[in-house]
């Protein structure tokens, strides 16, 4: 019941956030209850919400711009109306960013690693997602998911996460649409050409999954969401795997790739 009351507050407060605050799955469909066991729902009492990805029993990967005070993290959650018996609530014990100042740009270092206050036990609805062994190829079919708005510019938040398939597209496509993106960045460009399918308000920090691995983190996109079929920008997880492994191993002074 507490979570349902929280959602009611989120529905009122979250809709007032600007597009830059957080990203949604537009043009998708309700996820199967068994396909998102690694998906984390993150929120606070102020109405800010994001997603994250469980990468082992005590660590969640998300976007740096999803950092918030008094962060609550739900794992094993599917429906706000019908909670799973094995869903768990955690808080952040520690947060790690690529820069000590927590600064990032739209095209670089939008990544946050969260250590939970205590590990979760894997169950029917809770399990981790693998980090990438190789970067994704252009043309790869990937999966996005989250509790973000399912329409734009009008914001409608669902009671269950929505999923959609999108493609990795050439980075040059995003450079043309989103000027002045640099010639190179540690991001991925992904969407569906000519169709309004993609991430939006409330999905920020969630995973871009290719071949069963987390290849991207929802970072930002157009306003309205997926405007005229525009692709969105995702943090390229493969470029940060060494940093992630180092932090988890206890080397908290590890530096991110330049």
UniProtKB/Swiss-Prot annotation:
Entries under SUPFAM superfamilies matching the protein: Trypsin-like serine proteases (SSF50494)
Name of protein: Alpha-fibrinogenase-like
Statement: the UniProt record of this protein carries the keyword Ribosomal protein: no
Subunit structure and binding partners: Monomer.
Active-site residues from the entry: 65 (charge relay system), 110 (charge relay system), 204 (charge relay system)
Signal peptide: 1-18
Glycosylation sites: 44
Residue ranges of the propeptide: 19-24
SMART domains in alphabetical order: Tryp_SPc
């Amino acid at each position: 019941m507490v979570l349902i009351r929280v959602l009611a507050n989120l529905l009122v407060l979250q809709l007032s956030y600007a597009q830059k605050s957080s990203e949604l799955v537009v043009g998708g469909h309700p996820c199967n209850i068994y396909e998102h066991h690694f998906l984390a729902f993150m929120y606070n009492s102020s109405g800010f919400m994001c997603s994250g990805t469980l990468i082992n029993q005590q660590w969640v990967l998300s976007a740096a711009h999803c950092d918030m005070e008094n962060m609550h993290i739900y794992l094993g959650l599917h429906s706000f109306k019908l909670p799973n018996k094995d869903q768990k609530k955690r808080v952040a014990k520690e947060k790690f960013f690529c820069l000590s100042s927590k600064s990032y740009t739209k095209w670089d270092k939008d990544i946050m690693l969260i250590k939970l206050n205590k590990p979760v036990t894997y169950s029917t609805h809770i399990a981790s997602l693998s980090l990438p062994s190789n970067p994704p190829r252009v043309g790869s079919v990937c999966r996005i998911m989250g509790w973000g708005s399912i329409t734009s510019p009008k914001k409608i938040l669902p009671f269950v996460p929505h999923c959609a398939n999108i493609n990795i597209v050439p980075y040059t496509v995003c450079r043309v649409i989103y000027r002045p993106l640099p010639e190179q960045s540690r991001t991925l460009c992904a969407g569906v050409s000519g169709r309004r399918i993609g991430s939006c308000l409330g999905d920020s920090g969630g995973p871009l999954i290719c071949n069963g691995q987390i290849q991207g983190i929802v970072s930002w996109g157009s306003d309205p969401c997926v405007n005229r079929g525009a692709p969105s920008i995702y943090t390229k997880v493969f470029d940060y795997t060494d940093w992630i492994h180092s932090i988890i191993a206890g080397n908290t002074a590890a530096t991110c790739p330049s």
